[in-house]
Amino acid sequence: MSSEVVPLQKKGRKKAGAGVVVDGEKDGSRPYMCPICHRGFHRLEHQTRHIRTHTGERPHACDFPGCAKRFSRSDELTRHRRIHDSDKPKGKRGRKKKSETIAREKELELQRQRQQQQLQQQQQQQLQQQQHQVLPAEIKISAPMASSMMEVTQAINQRYQDTHNLSLSYNSGSNSNASSGSNSNSSLNQVFSITSQPARDLAAKPMFQLGSDESEETSNTTTLHSVHSQQQNNGSVELLLNAARFESEKSTTLLNNNTPSFKFIDRPPLTSSLSSPALSLVSQSPVAGAGPGFGPANGNGNGAANNNGLLLPRPTSRPKLSALSTLKRMTPLSQVSEPQQPAASLPHLQQVSSNGFLDTNGHAASVARNKSWTNLGVMPSPSESGSSALVSRFSSSASLNKLMDPSSRTSSAVSIATLMNEDKLQSQDDLSVVDEFGRSRKKSKTSTPIRRPSSNMGFGTGPASHAMEFCNELQSRLKSVDQYSDRSAGDEKDYYFQSRSSSSVCTPINSPPSERLVSSTSNNKTIKLPSLRSLDILPREQH
């Protein structure tokens, strides 16, 4: 018995993507073929989705705000949207965590923004704090300079206070020696002590120096320019105070003595250095019976204020001549008015009365100087006048040594009051008398008085007793310096700074006559007013 085994034939199966016929069976139709891999698809959507895998196109995008995912299939997009729509989406692990991280990221972004704002605010605050801290640092750097400035300021204030106290004590000492008008002068002296600093510095300097070095000439001239600009603002105050002093002293002088005299106004040294006080001469009372052109007041009472002259330091080309000539033209000077001696005690007045130069009261009439303080060609020559022409000279050698000693110049200036006190020690033989013109002169062998033309005549009285003492010493002392008289007065520079009419302040005895009277009687056509420094000691010779 033999049997044959016939194997079973397997049915042919269709492989995906291939229209292969197996065992004569034809697979279903796949009309949609992939152009890239030649794969066939039953539907067009499947072919399109397959082609997107080759091209990488993802047309389906998530429209949730903040989500930028895109998908190639629509079903993937719908599944993705579930994540955004549901709070707890189902699906794979990590989706829940991923959604939480997205929310946290948003919160973190908000926190970062807040932190940035806070940082900006902190930076601004730090910048402001740094700016405030820079200012104290700069102040600390400049603190030493400020301390040094404070020390300098305190030193200046202390020095000013010391000088102010010295000035007050000086004024109180000078007021104790004054006459009955010291009560009114004490208040004015206090006002003098509180004037401005430039005026005090200028007042502390002497009006004239005796025999200084040649090197001081340049410094004096530069000081003149620097001080003059400051003196212009403060000069009016000084003039008003001098006018007030003049008015207060005038009333007391008229009660005590009817004759005009001069008073020294010793301005206190307001600086710490030992500089001598300046001397200014102010007429105490106007001349009785003078016209409108006479007297320092000139009818308005402001003459003394407007006629305040200022003597500046002088070079030393001719120290003896300049000093003694200045003292000569300032005679007679007295610090305290004294009653005049009677006419009977002066034998020379009897001789003067015989010539007709005495008034009804027995006093000698004085001759006022010209405004120009110079002889207008009518003065007698030295040979004609003799020793009586020099009416103002010193006789005390100690006084002249003080004037010419450099050490005494540097320490303190020689005041005229000191010289007059030393004159009182002279013997009675050296006393001089008053001539018919009211001017003192030394006794000489020739008894012929000096007479000037009527053009220079003036009317008034003078203190004869003080004139004798002062002028006697000056007359004897000028003999030692006559060898310098040959030099011309024009060679010297004018160092005398005058105001508009300073001659009425510094003129002894009386004020000068008016220019109208002088021009009508004098032979000169024009009258110039040279300074006091430019005058010679001896009168010029007549030609």
Swiss-Prot record:
A zinc finger (C2H2-type) spans 32-54, 60-84. GO terms for cellular component: cytoplasm; nucleus. Residues 73-89, 484-495 have a biased composition (Basic and acidic residues). It holds the Pfam family zf-C2H2. It is found in: Nucleus. Residues 1-28, 73-102, 167-187, 212-233, 292-318, 437-464, 482-525 are annotated as: Disordered. Residues 303-313 have a biased composition (Low complexity). Keywords: Carbohydrate metabolism, DNA-binding, Metal-binding, Nucleus, Repeat, Repressor, Transcription, Transcription regulation, Zinc, Zinc-finger. One of its GO terms (molecular function) is RNA polymerase II cis-regulatory region sequence-specific DNA binding. PROSITE patterns: ZINC_FINGER_C2H2_1 (PS00028), ZINC_FINGER_C2H2_2 (PS50157). The keyword Zinc-finger applies. Involved in glucose repression of glucose metabolism genes. PANTHER family: REGULATORY PROTEIN MIG1-RELATED. This is Regulatory protein MIG1. It comes from Kluyveromyces marxianus. The lineage of its organism: Eukaryota, Fungi, Dikarya, Ascomycota, Saccharomycotina. The gene is MIG1.
